[in-house]
Amino acid sequence: MLDKRAQILLKTLIEHYISDGQPVGSRKLSVASGLDLSPASIRNIMSELEDHGFIASPHTSAGRIPTQRGYRLFVDTLLTVQPLQNQEIRKLENVLSSPDPQELINKAAELLSSLTHFAGLVMIPKRQGAAFRHLEFLPLSEKRILVIIVTTDGAVQNRIILAEKPYSASDLTQASNFFNQHYAGNTLDEVKQKLHEELKQMQSDMTRLMAAALEASSKTADNKDGVVIAGKRNLLDVQDLSTNVSSLRKLFEMFEHRTSLMQLLDQSQKASGVQIFIGGESGYLPLDECSMVTAPYETNGQTIGTLGVIGPTRMAYERVIPIVDITAKLLSNALSNNH
């Protein structure tokens, strides 16, 4: 563990580097840190910090810059977070006000982007968390069937399935009535589990039809468009990112395809609060030059998604962390109130 003087110098160095992006020299540190140390003592501590991998020397400068490890120690133990003022929180509450859940999610992403000037993202809740209210089968042709699924959060899904055999309109009405009578109020996961058990016991046409409907619904829940991203273009204005065209291209490809982004957000959903991935910690190459700050959001006590911000590793963590945290809480409140 670093002693108090080394911690103060590291904190001062990182705060200055985040502020202006310039390598920090020992002379500036001796003035800014408030420590009564000789330049030689400061250089010795800087060498110690460099040996431990917390700072590094760019080839073009005599100053030092923080490494990924340095940022991690800073965020975990040295950072002083700046809480949002009540007036700011009230403004955010007014923005996150809508009876439409999808509009709330879009607004939350835009809010994160506008407040941080980075990319804001909100994972769209998967349908697994919502309970079924109503299901209807409608014949389109001999084997093509339109499935209409309505969930308790007001979402409506229309899916076309290809049945193994022809069904009459009366068969489909009977199947719809049976499903609504036995499964209304259950979540998608619960219904899938029950149908799985029933399929093991009896291979009935009705059970197979319902299983096909659920499979079609599940595919939608896991699609690549399951995240709203706002402010991607902000990252083009971030000097730390825009100078590396190759890395920036990979990052935008990640935004386009979204599968790995969804996996990372899914992983963050298991956290109890704000989670921070610095540089390569995420395990995804396009984010090696970035930091990602995330927080789960919920409705009525149940976690249903994750939101966050993607920006450079040189970001004002003391400001971004509370913005992500309060946005997650306000989105949770707004979604719960809608229910």
Curated annotation (Swiss-Prot):
Q: Which SUPFAM superfamilies match?
A: GAF domain-like, Winged helix' DNA-binding domain
* Record-level Gene Ontology MF annotations: DNA binding
Q: Which InterPro entries match?
A: GAF-like_dom_sf (IPR029016), HrcA (IPR002571), HrcA_C (IPR021153), WH-like_DNA-bd_sf (IPR036388), WH_DNA-bd_sf (IPR036390), WHTH_transcript_rep_HrcA_IDD (IPR023120)
List the Gene3D superfamilies: 3.30.450.40, Heat-inducible transcription repressor hrca homolog, domain 3, Winged helix-like DNA-binding domain superfamily/Winged helix DNA-binding domain
> Superkingdom of this entry's organism?
Bacteria
GO biological process terms on file:
negative regulation of DNA-templated transcription
Keywords from the named record:
Repressor, Stress response, Transcription, Transcription regulation
Q: Which NCBIfam families match?
A: hrcA (TIGR00331)
Instruction: Name the protein family.
Output: Belongs to the HrcA family.
Task performed by this protein:
Negative regulator of class I heat shock genes (grpE-dnaK-dnaJ and groELS operons). Prevents heat-shock induction of these operons.
User: What protein name applies here?
Assistant: Heat-inducible transcription repressor HrcA
**Which organism does this record belong to?**
Methylobacillus flagellatus (strain ATCC 51484 / DSM 6875 / VKM B-1610 / KT)
Lineage of the organism: Bacteria, Pseudomonadati, Pseudomonadota, Betaproteobacteria, Nitrosomonadales
